[in-house]
From Swiss-Prot:
Disulphides: none
Gene this chain is encoded by: mRpL33
GO terms assigned for molecular function: structural constituent of ribosome
InterPro entries per record: Mitoribosomal_protein_bL33, Ribosomal_bL33_sf, Ribosomal_zn-bd
Lineage: Eukaryota, Metazoa, Ecdysozoa, Arthropoda, Hexapoda
Subunit-level organization: Component of the mitochondrial ribosome large subunit (39S) which comprises a 16S rRNA and about 50 distinct proteins.
Organism: Drosophila melanogaster (Fruit fly)
Aminoacyl-tRNA synthetase listed as a keyword: no
The protein's name: Large ribosomal subunit protein bL33m
Keyword Mitochondrion assigned: yes
Protein's cellular compartments: Mitochondrion
Cellular component, GO annotation: mitochondrial large ribosomal subunit; mitochondrion
Keywords: Mitochondrion, Ribonucleoprotein, Ribosomal protein, Transit peptide
Length: 64
């Protein structure tokens, strides 16, 4: 094993994929955000209720 292999660190991605869930109906979709950013809260059209609704980040899925 070479010394250079030991010195390399695994690089983390700058963005992560998260699940956003509607507060009103429970509709979910995936979105990307920066790893260091705060949790997402956005207003977006909800197809279940046919109106705009608040979506909150529910959980992290994976690095991207």
């Amino acid at each position: 094993m070479r010394l250079t292999n030991v010195l390399f660190k695994k690089v983390k991605s700058k963005r992560i994929m998260v699940v956003l869930e509607s507060v009103v109906s429970g509709h979910q979709f995936n979105a990307f955000r920066d790893r260091l950013a705060d949790k997402l809260e956005i207003i977006r059209f909800d197809p279940y209720i046919q109106q705009e609704s608040l979506y909150r980040e529910r959980k992290k899925i994976r690095s991207a």
